[in-house]
């Protein structure tokens, strides 16, 4: 498991990523890496026993990271009130089924959003996962938290 957070309010422009400033639980095995001050997480697609035997597990094409994200979001001051949304993205491409949408009635009216999604990372590759503002207006994100776990691994990392 690896956990990252950002409690202070941050303004995230359309198309940009949420920045995570605190490492709550680091990944000690190198499967999840984050550059300090970045919203991008490099996930490694290591699959156990992928080249050892002819069992069904060797045919698994992806490493699955259970990715849980939660935060409070609001329309930023000075922006037009409109529906706002954030979503998980792999290598900059939004995962549509992870989109979290709210419709505030006023600026700075916070809503809690969350998603818990299985994110496939290609075997033996590394891919970048982030949380992106998919709205058409700047938003404020506060108390952001993201957790990555690998259910297929029976050891703690």
Q: Predicted segment positions?
A:
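Extracellular jelly-roll beta-sandwich "head" domains, especially the C-terminal globular C1q domain
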Residues: 1-157
């Amino acid at each position: 498991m690896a956990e990252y957070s950002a409690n202070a309010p941050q303004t995230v422009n359309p198309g940009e990523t949420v920045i995570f400033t605190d490492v709550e639980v680091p990944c000690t095995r190198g499967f999840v890496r984050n550059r300090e001050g970045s919203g991008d997480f490099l996930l490694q697609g290591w699959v156990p026993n992928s080249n050892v035997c002819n069992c069904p597990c060797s045919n698994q094409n992806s490493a699955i990271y259970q990715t849980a994200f939660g935060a409070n979001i609001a329309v930023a001051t000075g922006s037009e009130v409109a529906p706002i949304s954030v979503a998980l993205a792999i290598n900059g491409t939004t995962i549509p089924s992870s989109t979290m949408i709210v419709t505030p009635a006023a600026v700075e009216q916070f809503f809690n959003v969350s998603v818990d999604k299985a994110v496939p990372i290609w075997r033996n590759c590394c891919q970048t996962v982030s949380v992106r503002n998919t709205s058409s207006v700047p938003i404020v994100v506060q108390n952001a938290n993201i957790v990555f776990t690998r259910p297929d691994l029976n050891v703690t990392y």
